[in-house]
């Protein structure tokens, strides 16, 4: 025996009702006003249907008749229909006004919720930006301090190129730092030196220090 797959939510139940009673219920377009007391007819028609319970039918019917599409179609003089789509009454002015009031209240509620959400979003973002900026500033300050701390204070004394000999230890200024080197050869206004890393370069007198 095949197990019956029960419906689990209003959306599924309403879709099932549209399938069973297409002349009464609909998912698109303007919905038709329903017969007064339709729930009883619905409960009797589906009393042996294991897929849906009376409680589910009541909840789904309430959701269907509270939908904006249904309320929009509830105008004075509109024809009410039964499960088979037969006309069984006219929507009275009182009921039409009640439907219009429900529709207006529902729209106002949604508009208020959207406005509240829109107003709340900037409030959440601003502190985050301020914290991020503060954190970034602190990070930059720490980094700058670290850089300043790491820079060694190098004392450089000018040296006469003519006094240099092969094998002398000197300092070569490279950018903002000074690197130790050994003199390999002195030629006119420059000298060939070997840095600690083994690199051999030729530098002019203004870059050589004791």
UniProtKB/Swiss-Prot annotation:
Molecular function terms from GO: RNA strand annealing activity; RNA strand-exchange activity
Keyword RNA-binding: yes
UniProt KW Oxidoreductase keyword: no
Disulfide bonds listed in the record: none
Composition-biased stretches (Basic residues): 123-132
Subcellular location: Cytoplasm
Role of this protein: RNA chaperone with significant RNA binding, RNA strand exchange and RNA duplexing activities.
Alphabetical UniProt keywords: Chaperone, Cytoplasm, RNA-binding
Classification via InterPro entries: ProQ (IPR023529), ProQ/FinO (IPR016103), ProQ/FinO_sf (IPR036442), ProQ_C (IPR035236)
Chain spans, region Disordered: 118-146
Family note: Belongs to the ProQ family.
Lineage of origin: Bacteria, Pseudomonadati, Pseudomonadota, Gammaproteobacteria, Pasteurellales
Name of the molecule in the record: RNA chaperone ProQ
């Amino acid at each position: 025996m095949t197990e019956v797959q029960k419906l689990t939510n209003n959306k599924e139940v309403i879709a099932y009702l549209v399938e069973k009673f297409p002349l009464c219920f609909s998912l698109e377009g303007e919905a038709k006003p329903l017969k007064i007391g339709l729930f009883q007819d619905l409960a009797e028609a589906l009393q042996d249907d294991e897929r849906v319970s009376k409680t589910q039918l009541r909840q789904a019917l309430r959701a269907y008749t509270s939908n904006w599409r249904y309320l929009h179609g509830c105008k004075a003089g509109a024809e009410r229909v039964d499960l088979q789509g037969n006309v069984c009454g006219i929507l009275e002015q009182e009921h039409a006004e009640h439907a219009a009031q429900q529709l207006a209240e529902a729209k106002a509620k949604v508009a208020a919720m959207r406005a509240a959400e829109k107003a709340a979003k900037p409030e959440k973002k601003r502190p985050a930006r301020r914290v991020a900026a503060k954190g970034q500033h602190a990070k930059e300050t720490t980094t700058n301090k670290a850089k300043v701390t790491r820079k060694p204070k190098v004392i450089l004394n000018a040296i006469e190129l003519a006094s240099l000999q092969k094998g002398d230890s000197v300092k070569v200024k490279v950018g903002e730092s000074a690197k130790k080197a050994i003199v390999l050869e002195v030629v006119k206004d420059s000298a060939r030196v070997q840095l600690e890393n083994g690199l051999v370069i030729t530098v002019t007198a203004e870059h050589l220090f004791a």
